[in-house]
């Protein structure tokens, strides 16, 4: 149940957006969030800290005052480690009782449009289930039909207006960087597409052991997933002429999304 606490990721995204708008990298709420994260589930720690680091790096670049931003991240780390120590997370064995190493639970390259998860649950009325390998099921990241349609429109718009897209990416360069890092870690050194393993990148054994701390690596794509989701929503809402049209657009979007994923909702209910 603790892995369902995705509000932690959304809250970290909120502080990133707010921090960029206000030009500040330290928030007491963000410190509390990072401390809470390690108490809820350690898997969320690299996710919220990726967004915390992105905010600090971009604020440091804009203000040209890196020390306050580095101090902010250091303060967050000290608080998080203290809470983890109080909860006993740094004592005893780190083994979860499984011999599976990093790479087995990597994210398949079809994850965003593959509507199947653990126990072969069907998540779409429209899109067919595609093959997976190994533990790809643990990296479930299906966007849903409505978001895939809006996402396709967003990609097309971004390609046509590529100068605006590049300017936006440059403005949020650290966020792009941490998203790339999270995606690479989620895919892992065992790169899979549909039912095939495309290649396995050999890594030093010590690095594999370290990465195995988060062996269910596909979960680390969740911040990128929510960023894609929110980007699609913003793209749609900004192209509707009024609040009334925006409300109607959201209603249609939600209806299509719920209709598409209803098989899984009915199964799980």
Describe each PLM feature range.
Residues 1, 84-93, 111, 115-124, ...:
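Membrane-interface helix-loop junctions at the exits of transmembrane helices
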Residues 1-13, 39-43, 141-143, 200-227:
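Membrane-interface micro-motifs in multi-pass membrane enzymes
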Residues 10-27, 37:
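Membrane-interface transmembrane helices that cradle and orient dolichyl/undecaprenyl
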Residues 16, 46-77, 154-165:
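Perimembrane helix-loop-helix junctions
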Residues 28, 32-58, 78-86:
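Transmembrane helices and adjacent periplasmic/lumenal helix-loop junctions
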Residues 64-89, 99-104, 108, 172-181, ...:
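Hydrophobic alpha-helical membrane-interfacial segments at the cytosolic entry of transmembrane helices
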Residues 74-78, 180, 230, 236-266:
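Signature aromatic-anchored transmembrane alpha helix within multi-pass, membrane-resident enzymes
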Residues 83-158:
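Periplasmic/ER-lumenal interhelical loops and adjacent helix-loop junctions
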């Amino acid at each position: 149940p603790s892995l369902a606490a995705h509000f932690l990721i959304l809250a970290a995204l909120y502080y990133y957006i707010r921090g960029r708008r206000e030009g500040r990298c330290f928030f007491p709420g963000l410190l509390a969030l990072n401390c809470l994260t390690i108490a809820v589930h350690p898997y969320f720690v690299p996710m919220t800290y990726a967004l915390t680091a992105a905010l600090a790096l971009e604020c440091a670049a804009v203000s040209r005052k890196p020390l306050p931003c580095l101090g902010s991240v250091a303060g967050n780390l000290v608080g998080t480690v203290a809470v983890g120590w109080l909860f006993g997370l740094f004592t005893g064995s780190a083994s979860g009782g499984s011999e599976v190493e990093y790479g087995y639970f990597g994210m398949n390259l079809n994850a965003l449009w593959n509507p199947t998860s653990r126990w072969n649950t069907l998540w779409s009325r429209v899109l067919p289930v595609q093959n997976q390998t190994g533990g790809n099921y643990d990296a479930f990241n299906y966007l849903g039909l409505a978001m895939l349609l809006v996402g396709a429109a967003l990609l097309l718009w971004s390609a046509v207006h590529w100068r605006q897209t590049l300017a936006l990416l440059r403005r949020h360069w650290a966020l792009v960087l941490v998203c790339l890092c999270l995606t690479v870690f989620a895919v892992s050194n065992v790169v899979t597409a549909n039912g095939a393993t495309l290649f396995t990148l050999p890594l030093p054994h010590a690095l594999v052991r370290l990465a195995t701390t988060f062996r269910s690596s596909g979960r680390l794509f969740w911040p990128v997933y929510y960023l894609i989701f929110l980007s699609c929503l913003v793209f749609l809402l900004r192209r509707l002429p009024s609040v009334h049209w925006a409300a109607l657009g959201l209603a249609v979007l939600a209806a299509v999304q719920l209709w598409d994923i209803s098989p899984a909702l009915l199964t799980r209910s």
